[in-house]
Amino acid sequence: MKTFLVQLFAILLIIFLLLPIYQMVITSLRPSDLSWEVPSPLFPDKFTLSNFAKAFELVPRLPRYLLNSFVYGAGVSLISLIIAIPAGYALGRFKEFKFRKPILMFVIYANMFAPIMLLVPIYVIMKSLGLVNTYFSVILAGSIFTIPLSTWLMTSYIQTLPSEIEEAALIDGCSIFKILPKIVIPMTAPAIVSIFIYSFITGWSQQFILALVLITDDKLMPLTQGLYQFFSRSSVRWNELMAAILMSTLIPVVLFLIFQKYIVKGMTAGSLKD
């Protein structure tokens, strides 16, 4: 009986979480003249793809916004990997390092900060560096929130790898600087893919709040900010808006579905043990 109740609760929770997504998909496919139909049918009789074409007509810069969002997400992922790989290797292998535990504690603590808590200091720093209204400002700001968990995941994964392989490479004449690119990185491919997708999705989801304070140039806006700026100036056309938002979710969803095996393996491999 207890198992049944747990399963029932899980099913109801999943349905509750999927309802907004279902409503978004249905609204994006529903003809505009039926959008105000009351009561709104759970399964509309008519569907159309014209809302997607209309979204591009209403928001001429939509392709540019999509490209900007991809650039921001990919940039955050790249910086996260550049920092997390060597940091994770150092923390995972050199356990005699004096400040290893404080650094690991700081990495855990850094995950507790929400982006909205740091918006003001981030803006002040970017302003002083002259990076406001640049791609790099949003990428750098987004990386602040992905590097800690990325480093933690890489450290955890590296601890599951046998150190004998690296020791054998050293004996064969491989320098310490070549071990990371030639030995460690190929063996940590699942963790690298997991970190890349995690950082991309996180960077994608945080673009709006970061770009809202760092970007005012219309050409540099990500999709979420561009849609907000456009639809806040005019009457909301829900069908076209939902179509545009649905398109914005496809890239991270497709990436997750393609690499989900590596993501799960990278996220669950190993644990931090001293």
Model-derived features: where do they sit?
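A structural signal for multi-pass alpha-helical bundles of membrane permease subunits
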Residues: 3-274
